[in-house]
Swiss-Prot record:
Name recorded for this polypeptide: Phosphoribosylaminoimidazole-succinocarboxamide synthase
Similarity comment text for this entry: Belongs to the SAICAR synthetase family.
Primary gene name: purC
EC number: 6.3.2.6
Listed Gene3D superfamilies: ATP-grasp fold, B domain, Phosphorylase Kinase, domain 1
């Protein structure tokens, strides 16, 4: 069967025309990028794991009433989703100080935040996705006030649910990003959770060891990216656990880096 028309290729996914009007096929790649694609590489099997993890989380979120673009997984690397008009705002939810927040404000990485922080970034690679305020979003018409209310409400609900989901498998949800899109029904639009939720867009730390089980292993040259992604999938019950499976130990990667 011939491949359907390609619509768009991003850093981590390729979008193809879907089989029915109003649908799109998301293909998950193994490509890894960091620092706005200044650093590039490959994580073997990443696309397969991200597809499964995102499917799992989106399905659970739909079960608690979060509207999403996800329809169904098609195969190991592809899923069928609703076509949405992407709102050009990346929403970052932070529970623990890490990454750019630590650098901007001089807060030690790993410091628990007294309250959850929601940040907004304008999606523009040429501008390095600058942080923006609600006033910018309203001024330039990127989203309406009602849409931003829905986005903030969903972001908090997703954070509450995912924090519990990961805590149950001894993983700390440090921070993560979400994207949203709008679908039109006649003259009325509604906001859906879109894109993906996977170790690519979440900071996930082991609660006991503080090992990083996410793309920071690639960003910071820690090694063990494949093992970390697989560990997330295993703990979520998405990969079979062999009887002789050892507890994840990334010590060898630290030794290879002379740490």
């Amino acid at each position: 069967m011939s491949r359907r028309r390609q619509i768009y290729e991003g850093k981590a996914k390729i979008l193809y025309e879907g089989p029915e009007p109003g649908t799109i096929i998301q293909y998950f790649k193994d490509d890894a990028t960091a620092f706005n694609a200044q650093k590039k590489g490959m994580i073997s099997g990443k696309g397969v794991i991200n597809n499964r993890v995102s499917e799992h989380i989106f399905t659970l979120l739909a079960g608690i009433g979060i509207p999403t673009h996800f329809i169904r997984r098609l195969n190991m690397r592809e899923q069928l989703v609703k076509q949405v008009e992407i709102i050009p705002i990346e929403v970052v939810i932070r529970n623990v100080a890490a990454g750019s927040l630590s650098k901007r404000l001089g807060i030690e990485e790993g410091t628990p935040l007294p309250r959850t922080i929601i940040e907004y970034y304008y999606k523009d690679d040429a501008l390095n996705d600058p942080m923006v305020a609600d006033e910018h979003i309203a001024c330039f018409g990127w989203a309406t006030q009602e849409e931003m209310h829905d986005i903030a409400d969903m972001a908090i609900r997703v954070n509450d649910f995912m924090s519990g989901l990961f805590a149950a498998i001894n993983i700390r949800l440090v921070d993560f990003k979400l994207e949203f899109g709008r679908v039109w029904e006649n003259d009325y639009s509604r906001v859906l959770l879109a894109d993906e939720i996977s170790p690519d867009g979440c900071r996930l730390w082991d609660m006991v060891t503080n090992e990083k089980l996410d793309k920071d292993r690639f960003r910071q040259d820690l090694g063990g990216e494949v093992e970390a992604y697989q560990e997330i999938a295993r703990r979520l019950g998405l990969l079979p656990v062999e009887p002789d499976t050892e507890v994840l130990d990334l010590e060898s990667h630290r030794k290879n880096r002379g740490l």
